């Protein structure tokens, strides 16, 4: 038996249960991973609350780093003792050990700690596809990133700065302005005090930005549309403030011929070669210094409720992990 966080109903942090579970036998294509560190991500809150419904009862968590303890008979990509990380289904990373499809794991290079790998695989690959594939950011671009002081935002802005584009970031408090600037933003707007769309237009001399990266959702959607230039792109990749329930092509898209996409990491890493390329780009960005990662806070696995309280209240201003 192994310790795991399980949920039997959707709700607040109180639905997270720290309990023993039995693991099934390995299928031929599967790997048993002994988790050393587990990533905390806002999508875990969506799964816990039912914003993104999952079958119940269920484990929770999509990201971890650990050591291969056992491999199925058909697994050829890994050996016992390899350090690996993942950011994928099946859900259940909040556990001492987890069984995963071998094709969903990636090797972690020397020079990257378990804690950093666990905190960077999902967020890092999210930044990779947002910057390079969902919309290929160019040096000449001006872009807007919402929640620039958040976990994804800090990594994204560092990486975008290395490309050489101009970055406008939004934050929800004055305390987070310096965090956003430290991580690469050229301009920072506190959207709790200012009309960010109006400010973006001032910064861009009325032109608007080439692309808006919006993981906030409901509260920022209309302003994001206003902030985009003619034939610009809106990448809506999260719903931290609530889900955008409807988009009116005539109202929202037609006036400026805006492109809109709703990307997520899974469709960009479904093919094994894409998964390996994305992970290698993330790890290379860390090892080369393009991205600097400092673990903000560590929690024990049994303190997952407290971790979720902090995650939902937005007091975690950097990558944080659970330690089994």
What do the PLM-derived regions correspond to, one by one?
Residues 22-39, 49-92:
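Glycine-rich beta-strand-centered segment in the early N-terminal region that forms part
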Residues 163, 171, 219-291, 324:
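Glycine-rich phosphate-binding loop and adjacent beta-alpha segment
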Residues 46, 86-147, 159:
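NAD(P)H dinucleotide-binding glycine-rich loop of Rossmann-like/cofactor-binding domains
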């Amino acid at each position: 038996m192994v310790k795991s966080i399980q949920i039997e109903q959707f709700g607040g942090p109180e639905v997270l249960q720290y309990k023993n579970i039995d693991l099934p036998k390995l299928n031929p294509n599967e790997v048993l991973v002994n988790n050393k560190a587990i990533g905390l991500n806002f999508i875990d809150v969506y799964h816990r609350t039912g914003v993104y419904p999952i079958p119940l009862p269920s484990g929770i968590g999509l990201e971890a780093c650990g050591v291969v303890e056992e491999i199925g008979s058909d697994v050829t990509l890994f050996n016992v003792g390899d350090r690996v990380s993942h950011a994928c289904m099946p859900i259940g990373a909040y556990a001492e050990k987890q069984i995963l499809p071998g094709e969903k794991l990636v090797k972690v290079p020397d020079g990257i700690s378990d804690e950093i790998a666990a905190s960077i695989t999902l967020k890092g690959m999210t930044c990779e596809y947002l910057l390079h594939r969902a919309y290929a950011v160019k040096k000449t671009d001006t872009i807007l990133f919402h929640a620039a002081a958040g976990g994804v935002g800090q990594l994204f802005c560092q990486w975008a700065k290395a490309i050489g584009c101009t970055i406008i970031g939004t934050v929800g408090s004055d305390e987070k302005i310096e965090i956003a600037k430290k991580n690469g933003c050229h301009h920072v707007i506190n959207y709790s005090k200012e009309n960010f769309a109006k400010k973006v237009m001032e910064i861009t001399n009325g032109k608007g930005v080439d692309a808006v990266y919006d993981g906030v959702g409901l509260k920022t959607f209309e302003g994001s549309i206003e902030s985009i230039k003619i034939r610009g792109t809106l990448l809506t990749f999260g719903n931290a403030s609530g889900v955008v329930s409807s988009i009116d092509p005539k109202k929202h898209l037609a006036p400026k011929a805006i492109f809109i996409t709703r990307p997520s990491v899974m469709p960009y890493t479904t093919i094994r070669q894409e998964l390996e390329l994305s992970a290698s780009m993330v790890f290379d960005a860390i090892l080369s210094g393009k991205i600097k990662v400092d673990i903000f806070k560590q929690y024990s696995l049994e303190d997952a409720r407290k971790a979720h309280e902090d995650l939902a209240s937005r007091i975690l201003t950097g990558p944080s992990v659970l330690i089994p």
